[in-house]
């Protein structure tokens, strides 16, 4: 079900289409930029500091992304387009644009596949989703997201430096989407690294039928 890869790397989701994939298709970003949407791993916390218990021996988090720059992992260069609303992207492209929506059902299994390009020891993956009634005309902020992740998939080995060979990035993994969701939502997926202060951020636009 969850297939680990021997060498652990920087990376991006290649299936299904993320916001990064769409930006690459539109010629706004290169794959290498989507591979490096990394920011502090303690999100949704606001500040840098130790990774929460029981994994305090992991490298401490650098500052997590600021509101409005969450989906790009805090990047404010060309990768800021990942944070754009439909209106902002329409202005950027000089044509009408809506982020493409992946059709899903509440409670279904949502599978992702990664392509990794630089080695890291993996603590795990964290999934977050927008609140009911969130405003698509505003950039994603902490206030737009549910307060707690709807799923976390962490390796439990401690300390990481004694188990690095076991804590492998997963090329394929999956999550059960929350029940009770309807309509348009944004999902944030974080690949959390044990031996740096960062996580790698990926975002998906979903339409719950």
Language-model features, listed with the residues they occupy:
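Short beta-strand elements
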Residues: 199-209
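Residues that flank catalytic or metal-binding motifs in active/ligand-binding sites
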Residues: 108-110, 121-123, 171, 185, ...
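N-terminal "mature-chain" segments and other terminal, solvent-exposed stretches
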Residues: 1-138
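Exoplasmic/lumenal beta-rich domain surfaces
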Residues: 132-172
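Short, hydrophobic beta-strand segments
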Residues: 169-181
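Short coil/turn motifs at beta-sheet boundaries
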Residues: 105-107, 168, 182
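Internal, hydrophobic beta-strand segments that form the core of beta-sheet-rich folds
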Residues: 126-130, 178-196
